[in-house]
């Protein structure tokens, strides 16, 4: 609720009054006081107010901004919704179930038969020799520059 006072010079002074009970738990006030934390550390040598779990850290630099992520999710949902009803039912109408299915290599043949994947033939490559092949050239005559070895 706002309380408005009119000052003698004609300007208004607006106070915001919160009549709701406070949402903070005052019983933790002492534990949050830096002076109390330091005194307790000096006395016991322990810092007990820290989290008891190890933090989780990761490289998040490749994650797009929130809007881009939401657009990606929306496009994925729309693509899933365009599948035939019997196929959506096969995955319990859940894009997550479909993703789990497609990520499992054991399901590759079924995914191809359902038309969710295409069979891609990998070209056969000639076996490469693992031995080092070096070419030897006769030593240069005196006064000639030494050639750079070729790999």
UniProtKB/Swiss-Prot annotation:
Pfam short name (any one): Chlamy_scaf
Keyword list, A-Z: Host cytoplasm, Viral capsid assembly, Viral release from host cell
Superkingdom of source: Viruses
Region Disordered: start-end pairs: 120-151
Location of the protein in the cell: Host cytoplasm
One GO CC term on file: host cell cytoplasm
InterPro entries assigned: Chlamydia_phage_Vp3 (IPR014131)
Extent of Polar residues compositional bias: 122-137
The protein's role, per its UniProt record: Participates in the assembly of the viral procapsid in the cytoplasm. Internal scaffolding protein VP3 is released from the procapsid upon genome packaging, possibly through affinity displacement by the protein VP8, or by proteolysis.
Family (UniProt): Belongs to the microvidae B protein family.
Protein name as it appears in the record: Internal scaffolding protein VP3
Organism: Bdellovibrio phage phiMH2K (Bacteriophage phiMH2K)
